[in-house]
Amino acid sequence: FPNNHENLEDYQRTLKYAYLYAKTVTLGKTHWPDTNRVMLRNRRIGCSVSGVAQFITNKGLEELKVWLEKGYDVIQEWDGMYSDWFAIPKSIKTTSVKPSGTVSLLVGATPGMHYPESRFYIRRMRLSKHSELIDPLKKAGYKVEPAFGSEDSTVVVEVPIDVGEGIRTAAELSIWEQFSLAAFLQRHWADNQVSCTATFDPETEADELPHVLNYFQYRLKGISLLPRHELGAYKQMPYEAITEKEYEKQVKKLGYLSFVGVEGEQAEVDKFCNNDVCEIPLMSETI
């Protein structure tokens, strides 16, 4: 989250610890031998940036370019140093731009490289219907409903959001500008694929798609496309634009949200198991 840092040095310090965490993960072992062989060889990681739209709004595109390039260089320096210390290969890929939707909510950042749907919008999140978070959310006035298509196992929670003044919205960006930003991040930061879902107006921009894809096929590793519709492309979309009046109406319904007494949820995972059969690695004795 570069926009959450006071200066470049502060940001580079965060990158160091993000890199160390990611690199340390590659020292572990999965229960898939094929995966282990690839990971031992490639040590592939992906330190991501998020809140890109906010950084551009506050500091400009040129400053973002400087931060990204210097940040990328410092990650390569750390990778060279720590790979030598660990006696392992340098990572073939080190940087990325991930969607970071839910994670971005925790720090008040826009997700990944994406601009907000509008200044005011509904953010929907999916939870297990057995989650201990549901009752506190309902008591605080948040709308909770069954997830379409997964009614037996999942619920969707709606949260009204105001991203503040000044920042542009996704509807204000042409399909060309969205592709250009993705290509900018691919060039100046990410050696993994940039995660980008470019939205477009099907009535005015649909004919542009063959041309924009043709031009950017040499500058992007991949991209997703989503048409913008007034009622949304599908039910319970993650982001839905609303008016300021609707936002204020939703906020007035909300009370105090307290998670006191809610215990953390730990996923139960059967390691090294396939159905009812488990693989137990044998430890050979060294004489």
Task: Show the residue positions of the predicted features.
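Internal maturation/activation junctions in enzymes
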Residues: 26-36, 51-99
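Short acidic, low-complexity intrinsically disordered linear motifs used
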Residues: 265-287
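Hydrophobic, well-ordered secondary-structure elements that form the walls
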Residues: 52, 101, 216, 278
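Electropositive phosphate-/nucleotide-binding environments in soluble metabolic enzymes
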Residues: 12, 46, 69, 73, ...
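Short capping micro-motif at the N-terminus of alpha-helices
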Residues: 92, 105-106
